From Swiss-Prot:
Ca(2+) 1 binds at D25, D27, Y31, E36. Transmembrane segments: none annotated. The lineage of its organism: Eukaryota, Metazoa, Chordata, Craniata, Vertebrata. Ca(2+) 2 binds at D71, S73, D75, R77, E82. It is a peripheral membrane protein. Signal peptide: none annotated. It comes from Homo sapiens (Human). The gene is SCGN. One of its GO terms (molecular function) is calcium ion binding. It comes from the Eukaryota. GO terms for cellular component: cytoplasm; cytosol; dendrite; extracellular region; nucleus; synapse; terminal bouton; transport vesicle membrane. Ca(2+) 3 binds at D118, D120, S122, E129. SUPFAM superfamilies: EF-hand (SSF47473). Its main location: cytoplasm. This is Secretagogin.
Length: 276
């Protein structure tokens, strides 16, 4: 392709790109339909401040450039990462996409991260705590970052994920950042099956949350179980709510008061009798 004829695209930050992307992917599926491309590019060009007189001409060129350089999938869906690279710098692209390319496997893993960065146990992640999370994230991916850039990216992430604009992230905001997979407990219907089926399901559930394989749930394992249990009846929970329910669960289930929930203790709480 003759590069002299390609439109030169400006650069947005991740927050600007996300603002446009959400218009087309409101429920965060991670893709838009190919038929929406024209409208998407039009909104992006408007966001970049493209002059109205050249916008329509550029629209065709930008779409042509995308279709030529990207291996668009055959299912008519355009993934976020296929479009983000056209408008974002490498670091901004990483900020937006790391969550989709490194999804968490379980709520236990999620709660380990939550407890680590909610250092003051306030039930929220402050801007300073988010900065620490991002610093560790860049280090983990072997990416060098200056303190000035780190400050800038912290602000960008707050713009994207702090939905109520109170300057801090709650449990649900962080779950969106980390692309937590679907609630494990949704696949079970404990009240709609036989005793044997309930016992079998209980074994699967306990094995899933007992990540350390000690025969007891402790620390983030209890947190992960509590989070998923609560979200079955209340889709949006806060860190403060989670801590309260965790305390109630331990009070009722932790019979020997060791701060853990043994397998037999949890079974008793759920009204099951299991073989020792």
């Amino acid at each position: 392709m003759d590069s002299s004829r390609e439109p030169t695209l400006g650069r947005l930050d991740a927050a600007g790109f996300w603002q446009v992307w959400q218009r087309f992917d409101a429920d965060e599926k991670g893709y838009i339909e190919e038929k929406e491309l024209d409208a998407f590019f039009l909104h992006m060009l408007m966001k970049l401040g493209t002059d109205d007189t050249v916008m329509k001409a550029n629209l065709h060129k930008v779409k042509q450039q995308f279709m030529t350089t990207q291996d668009a999938s055959k299912d008519g869906r355009i993934r976020m990462k296929e479009l983000a690279g056209m408008f974002l710098s490498e670091d901004e692209n990483f900020l937006l996409l790391f969550r989709r390319e490194n999804p968490l496997d379980s709520s236990v893993e999620f709660m380990q991260i939550w407890r680590k960065y909610d250092a003051d146990s306030s039930g929220f992640i402050s801007a300073a705590e988010l900065r620490n999370f991002l610093r560790d994230l860049f280090l983990h991916h072997k990416k060098a970052i200056s303190e000035a850039k780190l400050e800038e990216y912290t602000g960008t992430m707050m713009k994207i994920f702090d939905r109520n604009k109170d300057g801090r992230l709650d449990l649900n905001d962080l779950a969106r950042i980390l692309a937590l997979q679907e609630n494990f407990l949704l696949q079970f219907k404990m009240d709609a099956c036989s005793t044997e089926e309930r016992k079998r399901d209980f074994e699967k559930i306990f094995a899933y949350y007992d990540v350390s394989k000690t025969g007891a749930l402790e620390g983030p394992e209890v947190d992960g179980f509590v989070k998923d249990m609560m979200e079955l009846v209340q889709p949006s929970i806060s860190g403060v709510d989670l801590d309260k329910f965790r305390e109630i669960l331990l009070r009722h289930c932790d019979v020997n008061k060791d701060g853990k929930i043994q397998k037999s203790e949890l079974a008793l709480c759920l009204g099951l009798k299991i073989n020792p």
